Swiss-Prot record:
One of its GO terms (molecular function) is glutamate-tRNA ligase activity. SUPFAM superfamilies: An anticodon-binding domain of class I aminoacyl-tRNA synthetases, Nucleotidylyl transferase. Belongs to the class-I aminoacyl-tRNA synthetase family. Glutamate--tRNA ligase type 1 subfamily. The keyword RNA-binding does not apply. HAMAP family: Glu_tRNA_synth_type1. This is Glutamate--tRNA ligase. It comes from Chloroflexus aurantiacus (strain ATCC 29366 / DSM 635 / J-10-fl). A motif ('HIGH' region) lies at residues 14-24. It catalyses: tRNA(Glu) + L-glutamate + ATP = L-glutamyl-tRNA(Glu) + AMP + diphosphate. Catalyzes the attachment of glutamate to tRNA(Glu) in a two-step reaction: glutamate is first activated by ATP to form Glu-AMP and then transferred to the acceptor end of tRNA(Glu). A motif ('KMSKS' region) lies at residues 261-265.
């Protein structure tokens, strides 16, 4: 896996700038699986140094989303650890980063830049006008003695601190997912990036690297969008004389049509949305593990323990993964069908409560009734949010002209009068029924078909609409049993009355 000795230590270090993107969960999951497979530690660190994009409550959303999926951490903001604090703003307040930036300044490997944003914009515009495609900033202060820089700063001028990148030579690093091949970047293609903002707050490039070193991170697994920034990180590791971690840049997740990456700005992929729609955490866990990783190219349904046992970094693919909502939905259906009736009822209950079909808290009677209905939808359910609609007619009145159009009662090749006759016969037969179980109801209604010399389809279809208000519903005899004798007969009577007005 790598030449690094000792326990594997990996981290997920999100920025609290909004809801956690499903791609972020994939990054966290791969790090978590790596830690669990190799017997290491998984660390959660909140990188909140971007004050402008900081969203209050986002850090809590990140933690809640990870826990919902089933990802826990060995060290982090709420569980502590030997290398805390695990929130960058708190680390900044403790002065953790200052000695390291001072070290770079003293060594002439970083410098204070007094170039303003306006001047920088003018330089970019001038470069563009001159036909220079890639503007690379090198501040004039990079050649100033440190004493002069400090004098300028003491005068009150605002400044940033920039990395003094070499003008010559090349920077090399390896990426485990890209076969360990060496990636070579010419240093004259780099620029002097900002390490410390004018507010004194460190930027990602600097803060994450110091934190990774101090927290003894051995493997840096992150999205491939960070590959172009890695030369700067490698330079910093080398400037400090620190051992480099193993870099493993995860493949992008493309939209289903392959046109661009999944985006939390353009695509409905906030983790919370999948939870709201009724995707099981087991589904998300399993599906995301397959976004850029494969066990044998065939096996797809795997438990947490199986994924931990089978996961290796060598099986992560460098080519982009492709998001497939239909496949995710199908997988969710598979996991739903793995649940027992009682387990599914418990998962469905909050959705029924939000729909106003069941009280909150639910009574024992309500729970028992829901459990009795679950077998009717267990095989059909693919998202838990579908349950209230599928079960609504068991809880709400079915009224002709409101719930459904009375004309929907009429089967093909039948008229209203013929349908009234069918439903009257059904109402009469069921009125005499005392055993209201699915087998007994089926026996009675099939016998009625023979007596009337009609095919089951038209009669059963008309009864189904009368009872449920729909042409598609769970099996008819189970539905009648679930609705109950009194309500079933009442709905049949209402359907007959409505049809008589059409006849």
């Amino acid at each position: 896996m790598s030449s690094i000795e000792g326990p594997v230590r990996v981290r997920f270090a999100p920025s609290p700038t909004g809801s956690l993107h499903i791609g972020g969960v994939r990054t966290a999951l791969f790090n978590w699986l790596c830690a669990r497979h190799y017997g290491g530690q998984f660390i959660l660190r909140i990188e909140d140094t971007d004050e402008k994009r900081f969203v209050p409550g986002a850090a809590d959303d990140i933690s809640a989303s990870l826990r919902w999926v089933g990802i826990d951490w060995d060290e982090g903001p709420d569980v502590g650890g030997p290398y805390g604090p695990y929130v960058q703003s708190e680390r900044f307040e403790q002065g953790i980063y200052q000695p390291f930036i001072n070290q770079l300044l003293e060594a002439g490997l970083a410098y204070m830049s007094f170039t303003t944003e306006e001047e920088l914009a003018q330089m970019r515009a001038a470069a563009e006008a001159a036909g220079i495609k890639a503007f690379r900033f090198r501040g004039p202060e990079r050649d100033w003695p440190l004493e002069r820089q400090r004098e300028e700063a003491a005068s009150g001028k605002p400044y940033t601190i920039r990395l003094k990148t070499p003008l010559e030579g090349e920077t090399r690093f390896r990426d485990l997912i890209r076969g360990g091949d060496e990636i070579v970047v010419q240093n004259n293609q780099l620029q002097d990036i900002v390490l410390i903002k004018s507010t004194g707050m460190p930027v990602y490039h600097f803060a994450h690297l110091v934190d990774d070193h101090l927290m003894k991170i051995t493997h840096v697994m992150r999205g491939e969008e960070w590959v172009p920034s890695t030369p700067y990180h490698v330079l910093l590791y080398d400037f400090f004389g620190w051992p480099r971690p193993v870099f493993a840049h995860l493949p992008a997740i493309l939209r289903q049509d392959g046109r661009g990456k999944l985006s939390k700005r353009k695509d409905d992929v906030a983790t919370q949305r999948f939870r709201e729609r009724g995707y099981l955490p087991e589904t998300i866990f399993n599906y995301l593990a397959l976004q850029g990783w494969s066990y044998d190219g065939v096996t797809e349904i795997m438990t947490r323990d199986e994924l931990i046992a089978r996961f290796t970094l060598e099986r992560i693919q460098p080519s982009p993964a492709r998001w497939n909502p239909e496949k995710l939905r199908d997988m969710n259906g598979i996991y739903i069908r793995k649940l027992t009736t009682e387990q599914l009822a418990e998962r469905v209950l909050p959705f029924m409560q939000r729909a106003g079909l069941i009280g909150d808290p639910a009574s024992e009677t309500e729970r028992a009734y829901l459990i009795s209905l679950i077998p009717l939808i267990h095989e059909r359910l693919e998202e838990l949010q579908e349950a209230p609609d599928l079960l609504a007619f068991f809880y709400q009145d079915v009224v002709p002209g409101e719930t459904y159009n009375p004309a929907d009662l009429i089967p093909k090749k039948h008229d209203a009068a013929q349908t009234v006759a069918l439903l009257r016969a059904a109402h009469e037969a069921l009125s005499q029924q005392t055993d209201w179980t699915p087998p007994a109801l089926e026996t009675t209604l099939r016998a009625l078909c023979e007596q009337l010399q009609v095919k089951p389809g038209p009669l059963f279809g008309a009864i189904r609409v009368a009872i449920t208000g729909r042409s598609v519903a769970p099996p008819l005899f189970d539905t009648l049993a679930g609705v109950g004798r009194e309500r079933s007969l009442s709905r049949l009577a209402a359907a007959i009355a409505a049809l008589e007005n059409l006849a």
